[in-house]
Structures are given as C-alpha cells and as structure tokens.
C-alpha cells in the first residue's frame, strides 16, 4: 500500500500493517512531552496508574514554559511538583529557568525531535514538530501519562488532506500567511482529525522555521498533525543539532481524502480577525483598526527568523505612542542570537518591551494581559474570546512583519506602507 506521510511514520512505529485510514494501531513513541500546566495532571494520572518509573528517562521532556518565570504561588507550586517528579524519575530533559524556552521552539532547537519521530505532548501545539517531518500531536494529560509509563500509545490512523502551495511568495508574505489562508479556506474544523500534508514550490522555498510555523497551526483547522517531507533543508537543520536523519516523503500514489491547491502569486499579507483563526482577511481590508498592544513571539513566531523579520520593520522606527509592543524571543538560544545580531538593541530603541522566553500573554497567562475593550495584534496562534485576557478584549493574528508594522503605525498596517 502507498502511504501518506502520516501513515508512513506510524507504520514505522507499529508492528501492525497499516492498510487504511481509520484503523486503530498501537505505536511506540519517540518522545512524551508535558509543560508546567499539563505535567501536574499527567503526574497525578501516572501515579494513579501505579507506574513506578518512566519508560525511558531520555524520551520524556518536561518544559516549564507557560507561566515562567512563575507568576504566582499556584504556578510556583505546579513547577515545584513537576521538578520533584523529574528528579525522582531521573528525567534527562527537564527545563526550567535560564535553560528553558517555549517548548515547541526549544525541543527542535535542542535536536530532541526530527523526521520520522512519533511525538505525543500534553499541549495542543505539539503538532509543530510536523515541520521537521515528525508525526506529532497533542494529547490530554492522562494519555501522555500512559505514554510516559509504557512508551507506546494507540492512534486511529487519520485520513490526510494534501495542501499544495504554488508560485513565488511576494515580499512580506510568509509562512504565517499561508497557514492563515488555509484555515480561512477550510475553517477551524475543516481538517478535524485529519493529517494535513503540505507541499509545492512555495513550501519548498520556506525555511524549516517557516514550516514549523505552519505545522504549529494545523490544530487551528482541527488537524491531528501537520506534516512536511524531510528534505535537504530539514536534514541540514537536524544535523546541525546532532541528529542523523534520512529523507522522508509520502509514497507516490498515496491516497488523499482531499487535495487543495493555492497559488501564492500576488498574495497580500493576511490577518485573522476576532474571534476565530478562520476569520481571515487581507491586511488591506482591516487597515486602520486601532491597537493597544502588539505581541511578537510564541511557539508560532518566536524563532530567530521571526525576530529578524520584526526587526527589519522596526529598525529606525518608533512604536506608536499609546501602544505596548511586547517582544518575547522563544528560547534562550533565540535571545542570545538576537542579542548578537543587534536585534534586541533594535527592539529597545524602537520602544518595545523585550521579555524572557515565555508563553506569557499568548494564553492570557501574564506579561501582557488585555483589559476590557483593549485590542491587540499578535504573532500567536489563537484569538478566541478572552484568550489574552478580558472577555471584552480582541485579538488579531498576523505575521511578525505585519505585527511590527502595526506597532509603528498604531493601527493594523501593511509593512510596505510605512
């Protein structure tokens, strides 16, 4: 049988023959992941199961990223519980404090995920690693606890939707715009329990970091996973992080449930309007919407390429009076590289608030909460009502370039208009 990428990866991790979508299979996992919000629940379930040790201390990752630095007593208690569990179990990949970053930016940077892996995480944006050619998906904490104990889990083999992006990307149009275009087309449930497989000339032209941006938001269309073939760019990325991976692609003749094609030629940057990621419009149609806050960072767009994109727009310009522009490089590695390249100086001179590697305001956690009636544009992945604070606030989603341009203009703006 010719396999899609999802089927091909799952097949390599099970002893059962995968012959059709919808089949239930037991698969070995390459990595089980949880964070400071979800790990305590997973630990509770782990102990309730009677488990005494994790299946492999090198294949469990616990990343304290959502409320870091701990914002209150409750979050400090969550981290303390997880820290003690990690010590008890001898977990190799426990990250907190100065070596911690936003999990879905940190783990690829450390070489802990790569092509052909099966990764389960107690976080919905675990699908990010599909940008590297891994079958990665978000689980509930209880299922992750089972994977931590057993080293395996079950899957229903998902059907696959193939999304092909053709043409050449115009200036200021990038990965964030491509995934917003797809979500705008099929809706937030358009890929419900489907794997999304991305290809085409525009996809091949993207950096690995750009591909991870797209994979990150597969879940915003309901996707079980968002997958990219592992090509020369992928292998160069993982090799630089100490891995030895092989090329990986779908089999010729694989069966897809649906095939979509998008021509990116002449595209304008896109913005997702409140209160769903599917409410997508060209930036020109929302130009002029006033803003109180801009957030540049997150597991979607907090990598070094995103910092460079934002700095290109902000250099020599000032953030508009009355606008808070918060920049959160996603990992210590990104922070150090941004400092080395002078990007941090650019942000500071522009009047930005530059903070630590944290999820922070993305989930309405801290470091940038919106009040009643306030409006933000962010490079994050969700804009549900109340996502960044008050139920009476609004969040628009966009690329780092559009977010930076909007910070300067004080209104939603095209970076080419400055």
From Swiss-Prot:
Gene3D superfamilies: Aconitase, domain 3. GO terms for molecular function: 3-isopropylmalate dehydratase activity; 4 iron, 4 sulfur cluster binding; metal ion binding. Its EC number is 4.2.1.33. The keyword Acyltransferase does not apply. It is an enzyme of class 4 (lyase). Binds 1 [4Fe-4S] cluster per subunit. It catalyses: (2R,3S)-3-isopropylmalate = (2S)-2-isopropylmalate. This is 3-isopropylmalate dehydratase large subunit. It comes from Nitratidesulfovibrio vulgaris (strain DSM 19637 / Miyazaki F). The gene is leuC.
